[in-house]
Amino acid sequence: MTTTITITRPDDWHLHLRDGAALSAVLPDSARRFGRAIVMPNLRPPVTTTALAYAYRERIMQAMPAGSGFEPLMTLYLTDNTSAEEIDRAKASGIVHGVKLYPAGATTNSDSGVTNIGHCVKALEAMEKHGIPLLVHAEVTDVDVDVFDRERVFIERNMVPLLERFQGLRVVFEHITTKDAANFVAGAPENVAATITAHHLLMNRNAMFNGGIRPHHYCLPVLKREEHRLALVAAATSGNPKFFLGTDSAPHAKSAKEAACGCAGMYTAHAGIELYTEVFDAAGSLDRLEAFASFHGPDFYRLPRNTDKITLEKTAWEVPASLPFAGDELVPLRAGSHISWRLKD
């Protein structure tokens, strides 16, 4: 008899949907699995204003599969010049649910990011007043800091002073990758939470070098040592409401990944909930999947939980070698290999 599990429809609290033809290619994967998603603002040009967020949301809605109830939750891209008035407009809009902090140069399309947190004081004060979460890509970008230490150094250098200065600011430590981050969030006040990706739960840094360079396993923050992966699994399966699902699914064309200077990011939306189910199954914690995937996120964001359900069955299926993507190809995680859980229609 096939093993099945039925849970409240999950949400994705960290998603890259891109734009144009790329948006149309990837949106159906997320819309099939999730009720809502926090949509990242790192387009070219970035979504820096509420007006741009409205326009981007409209493009997403126009690309939505027929009959889908998926809801995009918009975000703004924080810059050195973001004003308190813009945060006021974001709050009044009802469509903006967070503001993303990218240290300049930290990841894809982050060139417009924050150069010094001190430049953002007025915006952060307004966010604190309105209860709008700050979503932090928590890595320093100094060339003299080892890429595997960027997250740990950011905690010491930036996150601790930020939380001391803005004690009422609600903060999501995005895509945590280290035991340092897991421990920090677990011990932080209740206004601090974290998202965890499926790929950081499933793989350690060996996956980038297994038999050769594996460009489709390169992401930012980069995969870390096994001790860190185990700490993330422990956090995700702990039942602690500070930790919740955020895929950080980041589609890039195959030609942009398999290159001399390839892009960072893994595409996981094709199996956005199935991969997490694998993790929780392997950890003997399927009974805690629903809280992590469906409850902790909306509770932190002060939104209602979804009311409909999805069912997954323990039936292996083979992931396609590639998917069509805006005139190119997109290589999904586990391309040509199997995933042990399947979402039932």
Swiss-Prot record:
CC cofactor: Zn(2+)
GO function terms (MF aspect): dihydroorotase activity; zinc ion binding
Chain positions found as N6-carboxylysine: 100
Binding site for Zn(2+) 2: 100, 137, 175
Active site (record annotation): 248
Signal peptide segment: none
Cellular component annotations (GO), alphabetically ordered: cytosol
Alphabetized InterPro entries for the sequence: DHOdimr, Dihydroorotase_CS, Metal_Hydrolase
EC numbers, comma separated: 3.5.2.3
The keyword Amino-acid biosynthesis belongs to this UniProt entry's keyword annotation: no
One GO-annotated biological process of the protein: 'de novo' UMP biosynthetic process
Residues that hold substrate according to the record: 16-18, 42, 137, 220, 252, 264
Domain of life: Bacteria
CDD domains, per database record: DHOase (cd01294)
Keywords for this protein: Hydrolase, Metal-binding, Pyrimidine biosynthesis, Zinc
Reaction equations catalysed: (S)-dihydroorotate + H2O = N-carbamoyl-L-aspartate + H(+)
Annotated binding of Zn(2+) 1, by residue: 14, 16, 100, 248
Pathway: Pyrimidine metabolism; UMP biosynthesis via de novo pathway; (S)-dihydroorotate from bicarbonate: step 3/3
Cofactor note: Binds 2 Zn(2+) ions per subunit.
Function as written in the Swiss-Prot or TrEMBL entry: Catalyzes the reversible cyclization of carbamoyl aspartate to dihydroorotate.
Subunit structure: Homodimer.
Family per similarity comment: Belongs to the metallo-dependent hydrolases superfamily. DHOase family. Class II DHOase subfamily.
Name listed for the protein in its UniProt record: Dihydroorotase
Organism: Methylobacillus flagellatus (strain ATCC 51484 / DSM 6875 / VKM B-1610 / KT)
Phylogenetic placement of the source organism: Bacteria, Pseudomonadati, Pseudomonadota, Betaproteobacteria, Nitrosomonadales
